[in-house]
Structures are given as structure tokens and as C-alpha cells.
Curated annotation (Swiss-Prot):
UniProt xrefs under PROSITE patterns: RIBOSOMAL_L9
Keyword Repeat found: no
Keyword rRNA-binding: yes
GO molecular function: rRNA binding; structural constituent of ribosome
The protein's role, per its UniProt record: Binds to the 23S rRNA.
GO terms classed as biological process: translation
GO CC terms: ribonucleoprotein complex; ribosome
Similarity-based family: Belongs to the bacterial ribosomal protein bL9 family.
Organism the protein comes from: Vibrio cholerae serotype O1 (strain ATCC 39541 / Classical Ogawa 395 / O395)
Keywords, comma-separated and alphabetical: Ribonucleoprotein, Ribosomal protein, RNA-binding, rRNA-binding
Protein name: Large ribosomal subunit protein bL9
Length: 149
């Protein structure tokens, strides 16, 4: 299915690109999220007439994400307390929701879908550097300190 991208999508394209994607991906994700429109003649004409407005909106979102990234990078270590055993192993784990809530409580709004934990949830007491993806091009690093209660 041919779609016109209204936003930069990783591994797919950027604003204004006409790309061929699977119909389920377009119908269930790209179009409902407002990230793409079907590539009909009417939509192509509509996109060309609104191109400057959409590019300005994308640039504004990128600038806002960069500002949030600077705020996240400027944060001191975020402390999360959890029950732990004698050897420092946690009862349970610290996941993306816990980290996002702690960063938000520290003053920078972050959703759980923006927190990246490539090695999985944190299961031990200690200091960690957690990657936060605020935009498809903007990453920040948050320092997280997990302590025993």
C-alpha cells in the first residue's frame, strides 16, 4: 500500500516520502496515529499545499524534544528505592514505568514508551545509565540509582 509520510519514521522515511508498506501496518498504525495518509491524488495535492505547515510542525516537535533531552541530561541521579535481599538483588524489578515515573517526579515529563532498557528490567541495586528516546532523532541519558529500602 502506498502512503505519504507526515512525520519521520525510523527505518522507513521522512516527511513527504511516498513509501510502500504492508496494508496492515498502514491501516492499524500509521494512518490512525496521523503519521501517514494514503497516496491518492487528492491526498498528494493536499500534502503539497500543506508541506510548509507540516515541516514547521516537525521542526517544532524536534526542538521541543531537544529541549526535553537537555533537561533529562541535566538531571542529577534519579533515586528509586525498592525492596532488596542481602546480596543486592531486588525482590521484583525496576521497569520502564518505574523509571518514567521517577524522572517525571524529578521534573521532566517522560512516558514509559520513551524509556529504553535494551538489557531488560533492572534487577540489582546500583547505578545505571538509562537511554530515553524522546523523538526518532533525539536521545537522552538519565542516571538512575537503585537503592534498597
Amino acid at each position: 500500500m502506498q502512503v505519504i509520510l507526515l512525520d519521520k519514521i525510523g527505518n522507513l522515511g521522512s516527511l513527504g516520502d511516498t513509501v510502500n508498506v504492508k496494508s496492515g501496518y498502514a491501516r492499524n498504525f500509521l494512518i490512525p496515529q496521523g503519521k501517514a495518509v494514503m497516496a491518492t491524488k487528492a491526498n498528494v495535492a493536499m500534502f503539497e499545499s500543506r508541506r510548509a505547515e507540516l515541516e514547521a510542525k516537525v521542526a517544532e516537535q524536534l526542538a521541543a524534544a531537544q529541549t526535553r533531552a537537555d533537561q533529562v541530561n541535566a538531571l542529577e541521579a534519579v533515586v528509586i528505592a525498592s525492596k532488596a535481599g542481602d546480596e543486592g538483588k531486588l525482590f521484583g524489578s525496576i521497569g520502564t514505568r518505574d523509571i518514567a515515573d521517577a524522572i517525571t517526579a524529578a521534573g521532566v515529563k517522560v512516558s514509559k514508551s520513551e524509556v529504553r532498557l535494551p538489557e531488560g528490567a533492572l534487577r540489582n541495586v546500583g547505578a545505571y545509565e538509562v537511554s530515553v528516546q524522546l523523538h526518532s532523532e533525539v536521545f537522552a541519558t538519565a542516571k538512575v540509582q537503585v537503592v534498597a529500602e
